[in-house]
Amino acid sequence: MAEVVENTENTENETPAVPQMSTVERAEMLLEQDATIREKIKSGATLDEAVDPSNKEFGPLAHPEQVQMRVAKRAMMLEAGIAPYPVHLDVTDTIEAVRAKYDGKLEAGEETEDMVGIAGRVLFLRNAGGLCFVQLSAGDGTKIQGMISKKEIGADSLKQFKQLVDLGDHLYLKGRVIASKTGELSVFATEWAIASKALQPLPALHKDLNEDTRTRKPYIGMIADENIRNMVRNRSKAVASLRRTFDDHDFLEVETPMLQTLHGGAAARPFTTHMNAFDLDLYLRIAPELFLKRCLVGGIDRVFEINRDFRNEGVDATHAPEFTMVEAYQAYGTHDSIGQLVKELVQKTAMDVYGSHKVTLLDGTEYDFGGEWKTISMYDSLSEALGEEIVPNGGPEHPGTSVEHLGAIADKLGVERDDVENHGKLVEHLWEHFYEDKLYEPTFVRDFPVETSPLVKGHRTKPGVVEKWDLYVRGFELATGYSELNDPIVQRERFVAQAKDALAGDEEACDIDEDFLEALGVGMPPAGGMGMGIDRLLIALTGATIRETITFPLVKPLVG
């Protein structure tokens, strides 16, 4: 008989190989594991007998032990004829309403005969023999204690409660409103039912969630973190406030195409897609501007849209590839009048969400949106920072500071330069180097170069600049506003200049939109326009990052 030789090498740090499975293969394997657990329960196995803690049968990609146990409880409910996900329960009261009605009204140990039917997620569970305590949480985080007594519901029902209910389950309780002996407002149950069986255990709610869980599983964050729930609610309040203010000023809300045959309305790299029915390449819009201006041509004198835009660019604390914008256009307005509108929009939103122009940021500091807002000129402020005059490029009759000189300044300062450069881009890069992250109080920055603003009307008295402002708050751009270009000949000239930049390799340059030029030819009234990121508005109001303001941010998938 051959000798068996034991492997004496140190394998302590070796990780067992995880089998490779497709998504479908793993899903089928998990269903097979679920069915196996149910068959064991059907055959009379106990909960402990139904689970396989080491996953010997199904391997490391199968359900972990805690999930198996919950799957077994679901199977046990089905075998007992109990729906783990019932269609309807007699929920007659919200936890918030019960709290509002009875908080502070009952003495310790006082009982009422008032019956309520409530439901919430189980966040705490304690077994005290013949009496069980649960803490139920409503969606807004309001909590209440439930008491389940053997005396009230019977031994069998209490045994079933102890056996089936887990943390994270949605639980229905019907019972009397009382105050416990310690004075805790409670519902003393006469009936209970699982409203939705949670198969996945919750993380420890007394610990801070790590960033990966917050971003990859936002629904867990909503359960665990009051700040995340508040962000969702405050975002909704902010959007509602914006709509009210626009409505107060007789603006009409419209929806414009997300899929576009040309990309335009902003300088940004677009996402592309393909429409099979027309065999047509399309762009996800980077801005709704050109369609909203068509509304002005059509006689809708005050128009706005709150919707998604998509830009295939970098991701950081204030930029996301998919984001929500509000854009608005007002016939016979200017960049000055639209600036006053934006100030009103921001201040009213702060009041509607927080009750004050002065808001408290997540780091505990206060920020004041009230009072008058500062205004500076891009060229004047850049000249001051450099100690020399930087002159706008007004064309052959009003030549400005040369591209060569601006480039030399940029190189000396170590300012990043684009592959395709012009006077306007260099001026903006230099200005951003000195000022962008330093404008803390609300500040309108005016007088932008004509080269970087192809859809904006030229300044009435300053050659080479346009009637545009950017609003900076806490060191980042919050909104932008214009006196809109409505001369179709000048607009064609601007489009041609952009097209030449595109041919030279500028991926952010706009296409020539002949249909839009034809619309301008029909006649667009003089107008002011604005754009503001909803996500950035929440950043300004809260101090959060853009990812924290988006309920379901895009996250790079995990590999493997």
Task: Name the predicted role of every residue range.
Residues M1-G560:
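Class II aminoacyl-tRNA synthetase catalytic cores and aaRS-like
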